[in-house]
Amino acid sequence: LWSRGLGDVYKRQAQMAQKYFDRCPWGDKITLMQGPALESLPKIKGPIDLSFIDADKVNYMNYYNHLVEITRPGGLIMLDNALWSGAVLDPVEESDHALARMNTLVFDDPRVHNLLLPVRDGVMVAQKKA
C-alpha cells in the first residue's frame, strides 16, 4: 500500500493533485480527500507508516494527537514549519504559539522519539516507539 490518504482543503489543488495521481503507476493506491483535515483524518484507519503535516498551524496538535494513535510502532510523523522563521522562540501570533506548544508536546511525548531537523523552516520528526 503506497498511500491511504492525501488531502487538501482547497478544491483546485486537490483536483490538480488528482491529475498527477491518475498518471502515476501507483495512483490506484492513493486516496485523495478534499476538505478540512479535522474531518478527513478520522476516516483514515491505521496503522500508517508515515504522515507529513503541513496545514493550518493552530490544529497541528489535533492532527498530531490523532496520527500518533494510528501510526504503527516505528512509523514516522513529520511536522513542517517547526521553527516557523524563529517565531516559536518568541511567539506573538496565534500560529507562533500553536507551533511552540506543538514542539513542546512532541518533545515531552513518551510515545515517541523526536528529532528537530533545522532544514529551511524546520521539520519535527516523531517516531512512534515500539
Regions found by a protein language model. Name each.
Residues 1-10:
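Single conserved hydrophobic/aromatic residue that forms the stacking wall/gate
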Residues 12-46:
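S-adenosyl-L-methionine
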Residues 29, 51, 111-113:
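Short active-site oxyanion
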Residues 59-130:
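C-terminal substrate-binding/active-site "lid" region of AdoMet-derived donor-dependent transferases
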